[in-house]
């Protein structure tokens, strides 16, 4: 269970006056999310949705308040194990030249010790099956559609079997059909694992029926957290899409104050609070889920050794390099082209610089000509050497950036 109690986040403001010395991005946010639950965090742009997600993950540390997981304070007590937390960004982080199966297998090798064990293949097959990627296992990432890439992003985080799965805009930018499919997948992932909580930050108010609860943020304040079916009634609108338009009718502080007065009654009515939840209430509240794949029991997840991770990164990089013909030719051009350029610029070699004689000719004109010739030889040699060095620096930088 995830609980937040009066969470506040303040950051330095842009001005020097007392009024704008600090900016309050989150203000007195309190909520409870029970296990096996799918939560949507919605709200207009800049309302604090992603900021709240970053506070939950620990990327940002709250200024005040408490965040609790299974009753323990995540700030002052034991934090979540890295394997217990999954964070899915909006855009794919998978490599285009790897296949779906290779991408997931590489993530498992980097984040678990399942590689070269009997548990590796069953765990990999389960992740492919539960995310609907079994038939796409041999396809390369670059040919996947937007919705399929979102599924792959979820699969990459499931390698550690996280109990807290946080999704940042994974349904944004998709067509209605793909958005509905990803939302149903999130609902499926929230079931089966006895402790799992799935949270999705989204702008869209479509497909809300597949969420167990909806949290509405406005100007850094929590102004509603309840079931989707009660959303329109609470805000006095006919359609969920009208919620955003009515937010400007009242200040954010009034919305938050109104919700704080009703929060306990809503939580008791809909069974969000563990203190009042009973097995009978839970069974009645939950509808039977169809097509739920039985949860695969993962062994205790531990991070692999640093050397193991390094070898996996090098192996993956070599595989990508061999498949990218343009990179192969680019590196060959750099490695072979540089010596050729050196040969072109110094085809006759760099002539040795003669030292200027200490003997001064009595003829001033001859002496000045000697000095000018010596300086010209120095300038030519210096320009050639510095130019070659600069070219080498540029080529090495390009190779390093491409490898990175």
What are these model-predicted stretches?
Residues 91, 96-113:
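Q-loop/switch helix immediately C-terminal to the Walker
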Residues 140-144:
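Conserved ABC ATPase signature
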Residues 157-158:
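ABC ATPase C-loop
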Residues 154, 182:
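Hydrophobic anchor residue at the start of the ABC signature
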Residues 57:
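Helix-to-loop junction immediately C-terminal to a conserved catalytic motif
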Residues 2, 25-26, 82:
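Conserved structural motif at the start of ABC-family nucleotide-binding domains
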């Amino acid at each position: 269970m995830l609980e937040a109690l009066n969470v506040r986040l303040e950051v330095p403001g842009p001005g020097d006056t007392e009024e704008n010395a600090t900016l309050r991005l989150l203000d007195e946010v309190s909520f409870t999310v029970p296990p096996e639950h799918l939560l949507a965090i919605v709200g207009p742009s800049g309302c604090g949705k992603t900021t709240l997600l970053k506070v939950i993950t620990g990327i940002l540390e709250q200024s005040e308040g408490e965040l609790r997981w299974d009753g323990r304070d995540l700030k002052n007590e034991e934090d979540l194990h890295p394997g217990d937390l999954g964070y899915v960004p909006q855009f794919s982080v998978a490599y285009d030249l790897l296949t779906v199966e290779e991408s997931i297998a590489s993530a498992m090798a980097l984040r678990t010790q399942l590689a070269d064990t009997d548990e590796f293949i069953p765990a990999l097959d389960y992740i492919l099956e539960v995310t609907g990627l079994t038939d796409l296992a041999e396809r390369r990432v670059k040919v996947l559609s937007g919705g399929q890439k979102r599924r792959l992003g979820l699969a990459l985080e499931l390698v550690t079997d996280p109990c807290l799965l946080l999704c940042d805009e994974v349904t944004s930018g998709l067509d209605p059909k793909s958005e509905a499919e990803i939302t149903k997948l999130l609902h499926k992932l929230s079931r089966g694992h006895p402790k799992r909580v799935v949270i999705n930050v989204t702008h869209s108010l479509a497909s809300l029926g597949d969420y167990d609860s909806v949290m509405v943020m406005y100007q850094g304040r929590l102004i509603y957290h309840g079931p989707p079916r009660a959303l329109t009634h609470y805000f006095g609108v006919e359609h969920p899409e009208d919620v955003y338009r009515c937010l400007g009718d009242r200040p954010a502080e009034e919305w938050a104050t109104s919700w704080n007065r009703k929060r306990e009654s809503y939580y008791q009515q809909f069974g969000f609070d563990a203190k009042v939840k009973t097995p009978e209430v839970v069974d009645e509240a939950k509808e039977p889920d169809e097509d739920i794949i039985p949860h695969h029991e993962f062994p205790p997840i531990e991070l692999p050794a640093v050397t193991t991770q390094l070898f996996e990164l090098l192996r993956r990089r070599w595989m990508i390099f061999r498949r990218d013909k343009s990179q192969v030719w680019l590196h060959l051009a750099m490695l072979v082209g540089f010596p050729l350029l050196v040969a072109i610029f110094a085809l006759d070699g760099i002539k040795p610089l003669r030292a200027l004689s200490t003997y001064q000719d009595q003829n001033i004109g001859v002496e000045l000509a000697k000095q000018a010739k010596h300086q010209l030889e120095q300038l030519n040699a210096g320009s050639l050497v510095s130019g070659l060095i600069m070219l080498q620096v540029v080529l090495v930088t390009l190779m390093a950036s491409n490898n990175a």
